[in-house]
């Protein structure tokens, strides 16, 4: 039987390595950033953080300023559609608004590697679905590649 572990950041690093997931740590926070999540259209940043014995998997996407009101109106439906994934808007004066989608796992009583692996996979899947749906409704800012394609398309249309 696998024993329960109350993981620290070192344990999370090892488990992510065991899962074959690349990550990096920045100088601004102690979170483990997941660059592969940026492959999903719209994802600006994704990370796993350990806060007060809770693992927090979160992803951020930049929101079109004109889409803040429609997205804010949809947040209740987004949050009601999942028991575990929660979304909110992060709006600060000096930055573009961001959609933050997160999922948490309490590890106060311990967690196994298998439970962590399942949590990470489920979080990736559910969080990416929320962001992909927001992107499909054109609520998010396009990535650099998408923005260049749209400029070209608009040029040919006019």
From Swiss-Prot:
**By its UniProt entry, which InterPro entries does this protein fall under?**
Put_sensory_transdc_reg_YbjN (IPR019660)
The UniProt entry's coiled-coil ranges are none
Q: Which CDD domains match?
A: YbjN_AmyR-like (cd17511)
**Domain of life assignment:** Bacteria
Annotated GO biological processes are: negative regulation of bacterial-type flagellum assembly; negative regulation of bacterial-type flagellum-dependent cell motility; negative regulation of cell growth; negative regulation of single-species biofilm formation on inanimate substrate; pilus assembly; response to ionizing radiation
- Record protein name field: Uncharacterized protein YbjN
Source organism (scientific name): Escherichia coli (strain K12)
GN (gene name) = ybjN
């Amino acid at each position: 039987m696998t024993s329960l572990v109350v993981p620290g950041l070192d344990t999370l690093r090892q488990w992510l390595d065991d899962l074959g997931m690349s990550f990096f740590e920045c100088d601004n926070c102690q979170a483990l950033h997941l660059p592969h999540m940026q492959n999903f259209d719209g994802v600006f940043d994704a990370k796993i953080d350990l806060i007060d014995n809770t693992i927090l998997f979160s992803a951020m996407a930049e929101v079109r300023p004109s889409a803040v009101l429609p997205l804010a109106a949809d947040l209740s439906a987004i949050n009601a559609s999942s028991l575990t994934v929660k979304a909110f808007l992060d709006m600060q004066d000096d930055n573009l608004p961001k959609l933050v989608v997160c999922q948490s796992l309490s590890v106060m009583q311990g967690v196994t590697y298998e439970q962590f692996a399942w949590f990470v996979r489920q979080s990736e899947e559910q969080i990416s679905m929320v962001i992909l749906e927001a992107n499909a409704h054109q609520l998010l800012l396009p990535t650099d590649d998408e923005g260049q394609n749209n400029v070209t398309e608009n040029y040919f249309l006019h």
